[in-house]
């Protein structure tokens, strides 16, 4: 299965994710939803930001030029929100699974889908 199929079939097709991407920890973009504008700089900055609460709280989370308010996170997870939209990012051994959602999707719905794929990737050393 290609990375694009993971984005399309395991994230967006669930209807619990509006747009998604899978990116390398080096900032490379492996697959993304149509219409999701990402820069390698944004992705690389996010990859370096896990477990840096003070940096994320001060600077927010930038995806596609949009700044999201940092809500919470740890060494494998980052959560953010802006108005009626949000972002949920899971770090695996080699990648980040990044998902955006908008109302009426609930943050918890997005989280379950993203974390399930993230857990599967971790179990498979990806």
UniProtKB/Swiss-Prot annotation:
Q: Which PROSITE patterns match?
A: PROFILIN (PS00414)
Q: Which GO terms describe its biological process?
A: regulation of cellular component organization
* Pfam families named among the record's database cross-references: Profilin
Q: Which UniProt keyword terms apply here? A: Actin-binding, Cytoplasm, Cytoskeleton
The terms describing its cellular component in GO are: cell cortex; cytoskeleton
**The keyword Cytoplasm belongs to this UniProt entry's keyword annotation:** yes
* InterPro entries, A to Z: PFN, PFN_euk, PFN_sf, Profilin_CS
Q: Which PANTHER family match?
A: PROFILIN
Query: This chain belongs to which protein, by name?
Result: Profilin
Native organism: Branchiostoma belcheri
């Amino acid at each position: 299965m290609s990375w694009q199929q993971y984005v399309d079939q395991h994230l967006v097709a669930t209807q619990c994710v509006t747009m998604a991407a899978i990116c390398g920890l080096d900032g490379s973009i492996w697959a993304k939803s149509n219409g999701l504008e990402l820069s390698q700089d944004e992705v690389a900055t996010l990859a370096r930001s896990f477990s840096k609460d003070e940096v994320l709280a001060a600077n927010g989370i930038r995806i596609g030029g949009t700044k999201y308010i940092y809500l919470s996170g740890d060494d494998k997870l980052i959560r953010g929100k802006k108005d009626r939209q949000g972002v949920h990012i899971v770090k695996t051994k080699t990648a980040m699974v990044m998902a955006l959602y908008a109302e009426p999707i609930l943050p918890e719905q997005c989280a379950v889908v993203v974390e399930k794929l993230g857990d599967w990737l971790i179990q498979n050393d990806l």
